[in-house]
Amino acid sequence: MAEVPGTSSETITETVQTGTPPPPQQEGRSLTIKLRKRKTEKKVEWSSDTVDNEHLGRRSSKCCCIYEKPRQFGESSSESEGDDEEGCGSAHCILGHGRRGHGQREGGGTTVPPSSGGTNPH
C-alpha cells in the first residue's frame, strides 16, 4: 500500500479515572517561622569608677593592679591570696599601689596622681 503525500492521521488515547479523589496533600502540616532580634554589637562600656591610668581622659582596663599572677595547674585562687601583701610591684605604677590599697600612704593620707590637680607637699 502506498502512502499519499500530505495526509496523516494521529490517534490519542486518554484514560480518565473517576470516583477516586487524589491523595490529600498532608493538610495537617504547618510551618512556623520565628523572627529573632538582631544581636547587638558588643561594646565596652566603662563605669564611673573605672581607672584612667594614663590621665589622658580615657578609660582603660590596663591598670597594673588588675593583673593576676599565673598559678600552678590545680592551685586555687584562695591559696595565693596571701601573696597580695606585696602590692602590684610594677615600676610603672603611679597610683601608689601597695599592701595598704590604692593610693594610701603610711601616714593614712592618700597620694594624688600628678594630673588630678592636687598640690604636691614637696
UniProtKB/Swiss-Prot annotation:
EC number: 2.3.2.27
Chain positions with Phosphothreonine modification: 20
Keyword Transferase among UniProt keywords: yes
Pathway(s) annotated for this protein in UniProt: Protein modification; protein ubiquitination
Stretch list, region Atypical RING finger domain 2: 88-97
GO molecular function (one): protein serine/threonine phosphatase inhibitor activity
Listed Polar residues bias regions: 1-12
Region (Atypical RING finger domain 1): 55-65
Reactions accelerated catalytically: S-ubiquitinyl-[E2 ubiquitin-conjugating enzyme]-L-cysteine + [acceptor protein]-L-lysine = [E2 ubiquitin-conjugating enzyme]-L-cysteine + N(6)-ubiquitinyl-[acceptor protein]-L-lysine
Region ranges (Disordered): 1-33, 72-122
Biased composition (Acidic residues): 78-87
Gene Ontology CC: one annotated term: nucleus
GO annotation terms (biological process): defense response to Gram-positive bacterium; negative regulation of cytokine production; protein ubiquitination; ubiquitin-dependent protein catabolic process
UniProtKB keywords: Phosphoprotein, Protein phosphatase inhibitor, Transferase, Ubl conjugation pathway
Role summary: Atypical E3 ubiquitin-protein ligase which ubiquitinates TLR2 at 'Lys-754' leading to its degradation by the proteasome. Inhibitor of protein phosphatase 1.
Protein name as it appears in the record: E3 ubiquitin-protein ligase PPP1R11
Organism: Danio rerio
Lineage: Eukaryota, Metazoa, Chordata, Craniata, Vertebrata
